[in-house]
Amino acid sequence: MSRSALVENVMAMLEDAGFLVSDRCAIRPKSFDIAARRGEDVLLLKILGNIDAFDAQTGGEMRRLGTYLNATPIVIGLRTRDEELKPGVVYFRHGVPVLSPDTAMDLFVEEVPPLIYAAPGGLYVNIDSEILADVREDRDWSLGRLAKELGVSRRTVSKYEDGMDASVEVAAELEDLFDAPLTSPVSVLDGAEEVRDDEPTPDDPDVAPEDEPIVTVFTRIGFEVHPTDRAPFKSVNESDDEHGQVLAGHSAFTETAEKRARIMSSVGEVTRTRSVYVVDELRRESVEGTALIEKEEMENIEDAIDLRDLIMERGEDREEVA
């Protein structure tokens, strides 16, 4: 299956599952392919045939964007260089959960979360430590008795009851022994934080010199500016008050800039953010929901209210963002 067909299939699957799905980010470079929202769940998705193509720089940016936009970064892929991705298993690349299309279908359409995750050494599951301790005590088994049944040390059983995860084989044996479900699903929509390696999120990239005047304006009027490396927008700008978040782009108004502004509008609708594109010369007032503002005009903005009013006047006033 081509990557383009895979992206289209994932988009159709998400729409069938009730998600609002953004336009595809058909520009390069791009840290994510689509954004999607269902209720309060917001996803940023990268879709790949071979997940080994997902590099650390892209993973870091997706995790940063997930933080700024209250979204979960997820990769959906078919295989690694060595094997097909197994259904029902969560993999990880650079701190981002990775699912096969079948696993994504189960999670988003059937609402059946995966139980298994891959980590160095094999496949593992979350053991509900409280239930395990309860069923062992109900049977009046000591830690040593259970350890003997499993063929492991007493210390290992104690660790299971303290929250250590178990291999798939051990988990299956435990459930057979006690005839009870003892596993907990992987919370993919919360970033699978309980099982993924605790990798620190990389710092924001440096601001490009040509974008510094725009960053200065956002900072001066009270926004915290988060530059991006590979997103269709140059920065995510956060305000603690009612002005919320603004996606910002900046360049001459070319055909590529128009595509970026259109994608920003679509992503903004999904993530409930406004978007503005700063251009050298104003030829029109908006591209769909993205307001266009001339650079000199931007530099003369006095406060966040002025910016908000200008964006609302020129862009489409979407209720979801109000």
Curated annotation (Swiss-Prot):
One Pfam family of this protein, by short name?
HTH_3
Keywords noted in UniProt: DNA-binding, Transcription, Transcription regulation
- Superkingdom of this entry's organism? Archaea
Q: Which InterPro entries match?
A: Arc_TR_HTH, Cro/C1-type_HTH, Lambda_DNA-bd_dom_sf
Q: Which GO terms describe its molecular function?
A: DNA binding; DNA-binding transcription factor activity
| Matching PROSITE patterns | HTH_CROC1
Looking at the record, the residues that make up the HTH cro/C1-type domain are 132-189
Q: DNA-binding region located at which positions?
A: 143-162
The protein's name is: Putative HTH-type transcriptional regulatory protein rrnAC2519
* Protein source organism: Haloarcula marismortui (strain ATCC 43049 / DSM 3752 / JCM 8966 / VKM B-1809) (Halobacterium marismortui)
